[in-house]
Amino acid sequence: MNKAEFIDLVKKAGKYNSKREAEEAINAFTLAVETALSKGESVELVGFGKFETAEQKGKEGKVPGSDKTYKTEDKRVPKFKPGKILKQKVEEGK
């Protein structure tokens, strides 16, 4: 599903009057989650899931086909843990 299709889905599910209103709601939600995560806070929506950050350790590796090696730095990455209700809905959709 692409963004335009998702906007249509949100418009119908949220009973918005226009696609613009639905898109503004989606944009507000994503901005709020981005803001919280960038501050190191987590966002928990009971039943849906939890958005949080995790530390990802740097890695060492070798470039295939050459003798060159590389190392990546440690970094903070976003993480999502689905909630119980979301897991059940996905399972029912099989």
Curated annotation (Swiss-Prot):
One of its GO terms (cellular component) is cytosol. Keywords: DNA condensation, DNA-binding. One of its GO terms (biological process) is chromosome condensation. The keyword DNA-binding applies. One of its GO terms (molecular function) is DNA binding. InterPro entries: Hist_DNA-bd (IPR000119), IHF-like_DNA-bd_dom_sf (IPR010992). It comes from the Bacteria. Homodimer. Belongs to the bacterial histone-like protein family. Histone-like DNA-binding protein which is capable of wrapping DNA to stabilize it, and thus to prevent its denaturation under extreme environmental conditions. This is DNA-binding protein HU. It comes from Helicobacter pylori (strain J99 / ATCC 700824).
